[in-house]
């Protein structure tokens, strides 16, 4: 899959690209429990990953993933909201232990079981609030087949470089729909490199330099004692309750992600000179947004387009862009506009408009109508 002058057309779904990119980027094991609409990922992983484990449930899957991560093997799983809700405590554990992993969350219509075969973008707020205390999880969101390849690589490498769980957000349509795609567009992916401790002195598992990222040592090595703990701890990994050193270490977990946020910031901004309106979207709805903007421009309207690919922590860059427009239209497939509220709070300014739906994909015409409205 290299760039050539000759097209290599294939009929492919996003799941296959995600699995292939995961392996090439350095993921070593897939651990999963079958759930719609993530079953293609489960199936392809069984064919492609060096190791694949079928867990009896989602809680077990995340616990096994933590075990593999502690050995220096990057684990990947995929689930939907019912499974993700069961994983939350273990994701918190992995975040506190600073164990890298990738959780692919394929959104479907809720609440609860909802409609497993209907798409949605209803898990935005859940992902944002996954970690108790407001600690951010790097979260990427796929908007097309290019992203299935490129953002998966970024997710794996961000997890390893920052020693953190990472969420790769998608939806039923994006990972189950077969589309015509030119494989020659795919860039080469090199495996991620783990930053291992190479000192001769005693190893302190949570000691860091100015990067705020501790060096890693796997449990399987025999030179140094290694501790992983989900309790509030000091640099040695020893439980310290609420001592200043332990609380400073917990605060570092948030600062670590924020310090390196620019390194995993990805978005598309198609700015049209003279436009006073911008359409913002993500995931599968981004395709409707792209078409809507193209059609509006063909009608002579000046409209810009912002596609968010890094959702969390919320990039300051998005506010910098949106603040330059007198009208902002945010399209997302959920009730009330979850990302819109996370961006602007409960009292959304009057010039910020939403286009929302549940149980169906948003149509370009709906976005066009809101752009043209005077409200």
PLM features per residue range, with description:
Residues 37-40, 62, 84-86, 110-112, ...:
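Flexible loop/turn segments at secondary-structure boundaries
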Residues 118-172, 196-198, 370, 375:
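Conserved thiamine diphosphate
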Residues 26, 135-136, 302, 324:
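Short loop/turn motifs at secondary-structure junctions
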